[in-house]
Amino acid sequence: MALRSINKLNVFVKRCATTLLYCRHKSAPSALNTNSASSPTSTNSSRNNNNKNEDDNRNNKNGFSGYSWRSAIRFFVPFSLGALASTMVAQREELTPTISARTLNGRRREFNFIADVVAGCADSVVYIEIKDTRHFDYFSGQPITASNGSGFVIEQNGLILTNAHVVINKPNTMVQVRLSDGRTFPATIEDVDQTSDLATLRIQVNNLSVMKLGKSSTLRSGEWVVALGSPLALSNTVTAGVISSTQRASQELGLRNRDINYLQTDAAITFGNSGGPLVNLDGEAIGVNSMKVTAGISFAIPIDYVKVFLERAAARRKKGSAYKTGYPVKRYMGITMLTLTPDILFELKSRTQNMPNTLSHGVLVWKVIVGSPAHSGGLQPGDIVTHINKKEIKNSSDVYDALADGKKELDIVILRGVKQMRVTITPEDP
């Protein structure tokens, strides 16, 4: 643009040169008359000046004197540069808003890929509430919410997938499902596998939005994923992150009797997100949100493992023999827990200052269900169970064994930060 303006300036000056030449020749006779009336000395001086001007004119290919060019430059250059600057500013003011708007709109469409994923699959995510039928709200008279979680629709006729720990092990309760459009339905539990921590629910409604199931075997570390659910009863909540590992063995997490390689992600999976989908950028579920250890470390059950569970559940339904599988229902305490393996302990110690360096084993209390025996006994999320009835607790299986002992009360030693405490819990019979 600047070169184009300079070329225009050059053409402008050349066109004005003719006018300058004409003005100079028009003024020449008067100059000669003046010289003829002067003294001889003046005549000689004028003749010398005329000879000098003629020499200058011969040296200048355009036929202008040095004085004439200097006059032209002295007049036209400031004027033309001002015009050039005005033209450039005007063109810039005209073009800049258009370029900025086009660029920003393009960025919004190009980089808001998370919003596109959510728009395509959020309608299939549901909120699950577990209502305690023995306790009622003082004002509404309705059963209070004992716990909550998430799930997602996998069949149009009302089949919903979630975690087993969301819907079982709480006696005297009922399950309620709220859809993304606000409609609420009672639900029945169809299949439960506590070994894999998976369950299916059924609500009596048709033509629901269905979540597409992808392939977790094709995932790579570093891929973007989106976790959907209802943390803390906040429906339709979205968090995003990347896959940190595609092969986190259950043994590394201290989960015995589970032959699962979990998906590890830094997408936030908090209370209430359990059972919700972990989806890829194609809007396909590639995992089921399961648990969180600490900020930036969460785990999901791979969808390929989930498909095996769903195939077996479908076969049982066809035979009319759908039933609960896995561990038998034990006495109820009301917690979700995670074994503290050496790797998890290292991560926790590096992220917090409130953990003793001497701690080498235990079970982390990840979630406490409100109104449960654990809640009534004083357990809190973040507590670390180290002993039950004077026996060391090294993994979650030791806690299940303590529940199966049949003792009426459990004397539990916990670490809350750096402080050691004791709590007493009376589990409920199934």
UniProtKB/Swiss-Prot annotation:
GO terms for molecular function: serine-type endopeptidase activity. CDD domains: cpPDZ_HtrA-like. GO terms for biological process: apoptotic process; ectopic germ cell programmed cell death; mitochondrion organization; positive regulation of apoptotic process; proteolysis; spermatogenesis. It is an enzyme of class 3 (hydrolase). A motif (IAP-binding) lies at residues 83-86. Residues 30-61 are annotated as: Disordered. The chain crosses the membrane at residues 72-90. Residues 30-51 have a biased composition (Low complexity). Residues 147-310 are annotated as: Serine protease. It comes from the Eukaryota. The active site is at residues 165, 197, 274. It is a single-pass membrane protein. SMART domains: PDZ (SM00228). GO terms for cellular component: cytosol; mitochondrial intermembrane space; mitochondrial membrane; Nebenkern. It catalyses: Cleavage of non-polar aliphatic amino-acids at the P1 position, with a preference for Val, Ile and Met. At the P2 and P3 positions, Arg is selected most strongly with a secondary preference for other hydrophilic residues. Keywords: Apoptosis, Hydrolase, Membrane, Mitochondrion, Protease, Serine protease, Transit peptide, Transmembrane, Transmembrane helix, Zymogen. SUPFAM superfamilies: PDZ domain-like, Trypsin-like serine proteases. It is found in: Mitochondrion intermembrane space; Mitochondrion membrane. Its EC number is 3.4.21.108. Interacts with th/DIAP1 (via BIR 2 domain). PANTHER family: SERINE PROTEASE FAMILY S1C HTRA-RELATED, SERINE PROTEASE HTRA2, MITOCHONDRIAL. This is Serine protease HTRA2, mitochondrial. The gene is HtrA2.
